[in-house]
Amino acid sequence: DKKEMENLLKSKGWDTDTAKRVMRFDSRGNIMINGTKGVQFIQESSDSILSGFEEVMKEGPLAKEQVRNCKFTFTHFVPHEDTAHRGLSQLSPASRRACMAAMLKANPILLEPMLGIEVRVPQDMIGNVATVLSGKRGKVLDMQQKGVTSIITGEIPASETFDISEVMRGQTAGKAMWNTHFKAWTPMPKSIQANLIADTRKRKGLSPEPPTADEFIDRSEEHTSELQSLAYLVCRLLLEKK
């Protein structure tokens, strides 16, 4: 419900005008805002414009993975006068190119799922558990003592947990008991991001290097691409950490 969404955003500190202009707010926190003023045919074109936006949110430019927590402001629209040239097949590709270029200009990053972990071990095994977590890019956040048992609370990237049972039991002589739960999406360390992007793209049959913003921006004076002859979209993207 549009009114309900407006009230929710206002309760989170958004100003009334911006909250009213939200065109789409998807389940992964991606937002498209109508920032245009006095432009014709916006209402009848919105579904086609949002189609391109949604396509990019499903397969982002870095590795064709889902996008999270991005806000786009749709700032300009020069529609074709002929209704036949303002359809889905014309506007959706133009919207997609604008969103891809905006994302790449904003220097997007990869996010990875971070898990919370609680480990119960004898007190003399605390160091062993800390070693396991640190060796898997995790860390200890808190420790409590209950009788002879130490309860260690920490976090660990989901991608590092595939052999956690074998490693944890090996380090604690089988005395550790633990459970994990999803905690948050967190930025992936830059030291491993580039290699992961390249590996993921290769696995999907893509070139190892992600595209650049220039590949989606028409810089010719005549604007001979579909961005001129059909529609011209300019989007500004801000990456926001929740």
Pin down the residues of each PLM region.
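Accessory interaction regions appended to the cores of large information-processing enzymes
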Residues: 1-221, 225
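Single conserved hydrophobic/aromatic residue that forms the stacking wall/gate
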Residues: 222-242
